[in-house]
Amino acid sequence: MSTGAYAFLYFGDTEQLLPAIEAVQDLPELHAWHAVDGHYHLALTLQDGGDAVRQNLETLSGLQQLLFCPVERELRGGFTVESEPTYAWLTMEIERDKEDAVMMALDALPTEQLRVLAAGTCGAVAVAEGPTFEAIDRLVDAQIRPLDGVLRVKRDWIIDLTQI
């Protein structure tokens, strides 16, 4: 499956999360959704990156911030969250003129560490995997943040709601 876009949603009132999850599950463009903890509350994998999808998401009740990332290049896609190990969505701001070099360096990381990797209008999107939160932190701090051209990395831990 080719990904059309990734979307990251932040709600001012977390009471709006359950209605938002129900609403996004009805979207025909939705491939997968994840509850996350960090800068956002929900991460979505979408089959379409068009303006109509973005506009539909913008109408969700209580939505305060939307990072909508249409995919221009997908180097790695598709993964399934399991109860073990730990996963985090990474959204990265990258200098446009250094994007190719950054993406090549990220693609050189083992697939076991970066399960998803895509570039788009919002920079780069990835899913990091590790045995612990600390292992993912070390990966980001030692191998991703220092890359020339990476301006900012935001980390959002994937929450397995079946474990709550």
What are these regions (language model features)?
Residues 1-164:
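A compositional/biophysical signature of low hydrophobicity enriched in polar/charged and small residues
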